[in-house]
Curated annotation (Swiss-Prot):
PANTHER family: BOLA TRANSCRIPTION REGULATOR, BOLA-LIKE PROTEIN 1. This is BolA-like protein 1. InterPro entries: BolA (IPR002634), BolA-like_sf (IPR036065), BolA/IbaG_stress_morph_reg (IPR050961). Gene3D superfamilies: BolA-like (3.30.300.90). Acts as a mitochondrial iron-sulfur (Fe-S) cluster assembly factor that facilitates (Fe-S) cluster insertion into a subset of mitochondrial proteins. Probably acts together with the monothiol glutaredoxin GLRX5. May protect cells against oxidative stress. Widely expressed. Keywords: Mitochondrion, Phosphoprotein. Residues 114-137 are annotated as: Disordered. Interacts with GLRX5. GO terms for cellular component: iron-sulfur cluster assembly complex; mitochondrion. It is found in: Mitochondrion. The modification Phosphoserine is found at residue 81. It comes from Homo sapiens. Belongs to the BolA/IbaG family.
Length: 137
């Protein structure tokens, strides 16, 4: 289930659904987020595309577009392993992953898998780039 805070926009076109939070929770969609959305729509023709800019939860300046979580539901994923699905997403976003995007969490599902579970996973809290993880000396 998506929270009201997460879903600030809902667009439905020709049976496709796009849910978005907006840039770092501000409600505005930045250029990197817009490029990610456009490229995934063009490459995968998703039935559902949920994109969340999680940069605000990390040690980056306000308004950054560096950390994203995406759920892509596409019939293009039928018969593919999770690794193959992720490779398709990475190929579509090669420019962004080679530049401004530092982290991308991907949920790539078939339409049948999404009908069974339409929950968007949550990310763990940021430990910061210079902080040690628990249990690490």
């Amino acid at each position: 289930m998506l929270s009201g805070r997460l879903v600030l926009g809902l667009v439905s076109m020709a049976g496709r659904v796009c849910l978005c939070q907006g840039s770092a929770g501000s409600g505005a969609i930045g250029p990197v987020e817009a490029a990610i959305r456009t490229k995934l729509e063009e490459a995968l023709s998703p039935e559902v595309l949920e994109l969340r800019n999680e940069s605000g939860g990390h040690a980056v300046p306000p308004g950054s577009e560096t950390h994203f979580r995406v759920a892509v539901v596409s019939s293009r994923f039928e018969g593919l392993s999770p690794l193959q699905r992720h490779r398709l997403v990475h190929a579509a976003l090669a420019e962004e992953l080679g530049g401004p995007v530092h982290a991308l969490a991907i949920q790539a599902r078939t339409p049948a898998q999404w009908r069974e579970n339409s929950q968007l996973d949550t990310s763990p809290p940021c430990l910061g780039g210079n902080k040690k993880t628990l249990g690490t000396p």
